[in-house]
Amino acid sequence: MQTVNVDIAIVGAGGGGLRAAIAAAEANPNLKIALVSKVYPMRTHTVAAEGGAAAVIKEEDSYDKHFQDTVAGGDWLCEQDVVEYFVQHSPVEMTQLERWGCPWSRKADGDVNVRRFGGMKIERTWFAADKTGFHLLHTLFQTSIQYPQIQRFDEHFVLDILVDDGHARGMVAMNMMEGSLVQINANAVVIATGGGCRAFKFNTNGGIVTGDGLSMAYRHGVPLRDMEFVQYHPTGLPNTGILMTEGCRGEGGILVNKDGYRYLQDYGLGPETPIGKPQNKYMELGPRDKVSQAFWQEWKKGNTLKTAKGVDVVHLDLRHLGEKYLHERLPFICELASAYEGVNPVNEPIPVRPVVHYTMGGIEVDFNSETRIKGLFAVGECASSGLHGANRLGSNSLAELVVLGRVAGEYAAQRAVEAQSVNQSAVDAQAKDVVARLEALHKQEGNESWSEIRDEMGTVMEEGCGIYRDQASMQKAVDKIAELKERYKRIRVSDNSSVFNTDVLYTVELGYILDVAQSIANSAIERKESRGAHQRLDYTERDDVNYLKHTLAFYNENGAPRIEYSPVKITKSQPAKRVYGAEAEAQEAAAKAKEQANG
C-alpha cells in the first residue's frame, strides 16, 4: 500500500471540498493538501445545481430579512448563530466568486441579476442562467489549480478515515484506475462528500452520492443530526427525477392540477397571483416542504394527472413566459424537458412530481464546521451545520458550500499546525484493518445481490419515510432496513478484477447508504410531531414543548442506532407560527403599521 503524507486531506472535490482546499491553501501556503475525489472534480454533484445561490444584494433587502426567512423556513430548528454568520458572509463569497471569474447573470444596467426563490420574501438568489452549479464549480476548480500545494487524487474511493486518540489522522483510499490502495496521513480531515438521498428510490442525486462521508464519521462515533428531515423538491421529471429548478417558478412558472387550477392557493400559499413574472412572494414560491405536501394532498383528492407510464404528476406551465425569455433565463430546462420528456416548454406544460432532493441532517458539526473528533471537519450536504433546520430554503445550499467551505478550510489549516505528535504505529494498524476488511469482502460467501438490496431499500424508504409518514409506515422501514443490513453481510462479490471494480465499489457504497437509511428511519420514528419536512399523519402539529431539539443518531454496530437529543441555539427569533400567503401578508402589514405608529 502506497503512503502519502500531507497536512490536510479533503474527501470530496465538489463545491465544498474545493472551497475548503482553496481556503486552507490561502491560510497557510506551506501546508500540503490532498484533495481526494471519487470522480474528476467537474463531474461532482455540485455541477447538477441549477437555480442559484442566496446572498443579500438589493437595497430593500437586509441580513435580518434573510435570517428571518431562513429560520422560519427551517421551522425554528436552525442554529441561529450559524444562520447569522451565513447571511452576513454570503455576499462576500458571491463577490469573491465573481472576482475569480464566475459569470453571474446581469441586468441591462450591468448589475448582478437576482431571482426569487421559494420561502424568500425578496429576490436574493444570484444565478448564472440555469447552470449555476456548473459555473460555480468551474470557477472554484480553475482557481484551485493555481495552488501547487493542492495535490489531487481523482478517481480515488475513500474506504475509511483514520483516527488516533480522538484526532483525525488521515484516510485509506482505493485508486480505482489501478486497483491499488493508498494511505494518506494527515493532521486534519475535511469531509465534503454530499448527502444521502440515494437511500430513496426516486431522487435527484447522481450515482456517486451514496452517503460515504456520513457513514464514515458515523462509524467513528460522530452522531448524525436531524436525519429525519429529508427534502422533497416539488418539481422533478417523472421518469428520471431530473430537477426542474425552482428558478422556473422564480421566473414566473405556475403549477396546475388536472383541471388547470392553481391549487397552491388552497394550502395556505395564496392568494392567487397574476400569471406572468410574479410580484407576489408566495403561491408557487412557497417553501419546498409546503409545495410538496400540497402535491400529496392533490394526489389524495384525485386531482393529479397520469403519465403514459401511470405516474401521478401535475403541470409546470412556463408557456406564458415566451420563447425568448425562456431561452435566455432557462435554456437548460428547455433542453432537459425536451430530451427526457419530449416536451417543448415554449408550447407545452412540463409534467412534474416531487422528488427526494436534499438531506437537511448530516454529520454534527459546531460553529467552526468541526465534529466531536478533533481535526475532523464536514461541510456541505453531508454536514449538519444547523443552517437549514427542518427545511432548507432553495439557493441557501450553494451559498453554504462556499461560506462554510471557507470556514472548514481555514480551521482545518489551524488544526493541522496545532496537531500533537501522532502514534503512527496505531494509525498504520488501523489502515491495515481497513485493507483486511476489504479483502474479507472479496472472500465473503453468500447469495445476496447488492442491486436487489439497494432496490428494496429505496422502495421501503419511499413508502415509509415519504412526504407524509405515520408510525406504521416508519416501523416498516425500520424493520426492513435492519433486515437488509443483515442480508448485506451475505453479499457475494463476484468480480475479482482490480481496475475499476464496480462490483466492489457498489457493495461498499451500499454499506454506507444503508447506514444513512437506518439513521433516517430510526430518527424519524422517534420524532412524534410534524415539523418542516417531517410530516406525520398521526402527529399533525408542531410540538415545541417536547421536540424543539435536534435528534442525534449514534452508530451501533450490532443493531439500531442510539437516539439522543441536543438543544437548539436560539439567538433572536423565538418559535412562532409559520405563515405564508395572505396570512403572512396581513402579518407583515400589521408589523409595518405598528412600526410607523411608533415612528
Curated annotation (Swiss-Prot):
Coiled coil: none annotated. The keyword Glycoprotein does not apply. Its cofactor is FAD. Binds 1 FAD covalently per subunit. GO terms for cellular component: fumarate reductase complex; plasma membrane. The active site is at H233, R249. One of its GO terms (biological process) is electron transport chain. It is a peripheral membrane protein. GO terms for molecular function: electron transfer activity; flavin adenine dinucleotide binding; succinate dehydrogenase (quinone) activity; succinate dehydrogenase activity. FAD binds at residues 12-16, 36-38, 44-52, 156-158, 212, 357-358, 381, 392-398. Part of an enzyme complex containing four subunits: a flavoprotein (FrdA), an iron-sulfur protein (FrdB), and two hydrophobic anchor proteins (FrdC and FrdD). Belongs to the FAD-dependent oxidoreductase 2 family. FRD/SDH subfamily. This is Fumarate reductase flavoprotein subunit. It comes from Haemophilus influenzae (strain ATCC 51907 / DSM 11121 / KW20 / Rd).
